[in-house]
């Protein structure tokens, strides 16, 4: 596989996680996942920005992206069942990684929406890759590539969402 092809398939593989991670800003709102509960430090577990609607909506959107991908490139997945499993695990893993990041940010007393460089851009990716590993994985070179480019994609997507009025801050 040539390097350009390898880059394309790395993006294709991770696309459900990218969509899942970006979707809650559009479909979120409603009841917070933590239900308003606080940790031993007196701060919220996750905060108002992490909602059930955003989490479930993000997982569904990411999974649907994977299903659409299957119908475009069925050979990449081998079967619809594999595509659904992989897309679900990438999406679920991405949002679990985002929740873990929010938990860590609350412990560090960072306010909602405040940037945490590295954690915001890579936590979702690392978690998505870990969750999806049992179904299908990438080469180490592809993973390194995604670790390098994902922060830039994340920053660009957040800036776009800010300019569109979907986010109140550009990070």
Swiss-Prot record:
Molecular function as annotated in GO: CDP-2,3-bis-(O-geranylgeranyl)-sn-glycerol synthase activity
Q: Where in the cell is it found?
A: Cell membrane
Membrane topology category: Multi-pass membrane protein
Q: Where are the transmembrane segments?
A: 7-27, 54-74, 84-104, 115-135, 141-161
Query: Which Gene Ontology CC terms are recorded?
Result: plasma membrane
Q: Which UniProt keywords apply?
A: Cell membrane, Lipid biosynthesis, Lipid metabolism, Magnesium, Membrane, Phospholipid biosynthesis, Phospholipid metabolism, Transferase, Transmembrane, Transmembrane helix
Q: What is this protein called?
A: CDP-archaeol synthase
**Whose protein is this, by species?**
Thermococcus kodakarensis (strain ATCC BAA-918 / JCM 12380 / KOD1) (Pyrococcus kodakaraensis (strain KOD1))
């Amino acid at each position: 596989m040539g390097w350009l092809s390898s880059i394309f398939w790395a993006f294709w593989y991770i696309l459900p996680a990218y969509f899942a991670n970006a979707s809650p800003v559009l479909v979120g709102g409603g009841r917070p996942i933590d239900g308003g509960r606080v940790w031993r430090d007196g701060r919220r577990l996750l905060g108002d920005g992490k909602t059930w609607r955003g989490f479930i909506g993000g997982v569904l959107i990411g999974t649907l992206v994977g299903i659409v991908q299957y119908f475009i490139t069925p050979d990449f997945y081998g079967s619809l069942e594999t595509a659904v499993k992989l897309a679900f695990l990438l999406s679920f893993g991405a949002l679990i990684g985002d929740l873990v990041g929010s938990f860590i940010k609350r412990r560090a007393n960072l306010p909602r929406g405040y940037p945490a460089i590295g954690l915001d851009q890579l936590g979702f990716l690392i978690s998505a890759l870990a969750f999806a590993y049992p179904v299908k994985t990438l080469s180490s070179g592809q993973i390194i590539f995604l670790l390098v480019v994902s922060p830039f994609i994340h920053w660009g997507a957040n800036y776009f969402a800010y300019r569109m009025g979907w986010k109140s801050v550009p990070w």
